[in-house]
Amino acid sequence: MLQDPEIEAVSIVLPDNMHREAVELAVAAKKHILLEKPLAKELEDGKAMYELVKDYDKVFTTGFLLRFDPRFAMIKERLDRGELGDIIHCYVRRNSPIIGPRRYIGASDLSMHVMIHDIDYVNWWMGCQPVKVFARNRSVLLKENGMNDVIYAIVTYENGAIACMEACWTLPENSPTIIDDKVELVATKGVAYVDSCDNGVRFVTGNGVQYPDSRHWYYVNGEVCGDLAEEVMAFVNNVANNTKSVITPKQSYDALRVVDAIERSIREGKEVEL
């Protein structure tokens, strides 16, 4: 497939530990690349991939779909315009039912599969480098699978701002919402909030209460809509117009660096530097 000159672009959705080889092959074949997050499973592979694609003359992007969520983009715009002032601290959470990790057993863990979304957009908002991480975990319901139930991480940035990140994927299977995520960002001139628990629509039936997804991937008239569709269309537009992605290789690598620091902090039981 990579040798076919009519194929200009590839989407890589392989398991995390296979990303490096797939990207290396795609780069050698001079293809535009949409890579599902994370950049890689191991930091060493992520660094090698970053070095490979940082000056790549084709489109390379990583699938952080929250970059295409208008709510998170609005916060970034107001930060860039100075309306909120300088970030003092923020709290973000991303919790979901246990059906998720039961599908992913052995393929990915909580920090890599879930928290990395929040890490990416918080890094993006901060506009500076993360420098220190302290993290704690607990495993109860997923202990026999060798996976974390919950992780809390405190990330300190170069500008002194602090981000507290919470991720849990062991909510009950019958939870009314697929993702319960929240943001509170406190800055010197204002505060920003995001609350995605109810998604703006609710159904009540004999089976209980449901808050279906109306943000990330859903259908309108049979067509996929939401952040995921916007992510794919942004990639297509980059390829068609010969422009760079808003998600840079460095940003993808930095998100992986924070994940690695979270796991190191958990293992060592102390704050670690990046």
Model regions and ranges:
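Contiguous beta-strand/loop segments that form the cofactor/metal-binding neighborhood of enzyme cores
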Residues: 119-199, 229-241
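Predominantly a Rossmann-like dinucleotide-binding segment in NAD(P)-dependent oxidoreductases
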Residues: 59, 66-145, 154, 162, ...
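Beta-loop-alpha module in the N-terminal Rossmann-like domain of NAD(P)-dependent dehydrogenases
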Residues: 1-52
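A short helix->loop->beta-strand "cap" motif at the edges of active sites that frequently abuts
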Residues: 29-31, 56-59, 161-162
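Aromatic/hydrophobic pocket-lining residues that form π-stacking "cages" and hydrophobic walls in ligand
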Residues: 22, 49, 75, 261-262
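Hydrophobic residues in well-ordered beta-strands that form the structural core
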Residues: 35, 60-62, 91, 194
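C-terminal helix-rich "cap/oligomerization" subdomain common to oxidoreductases
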Residues: 9-14, 158, 234-274
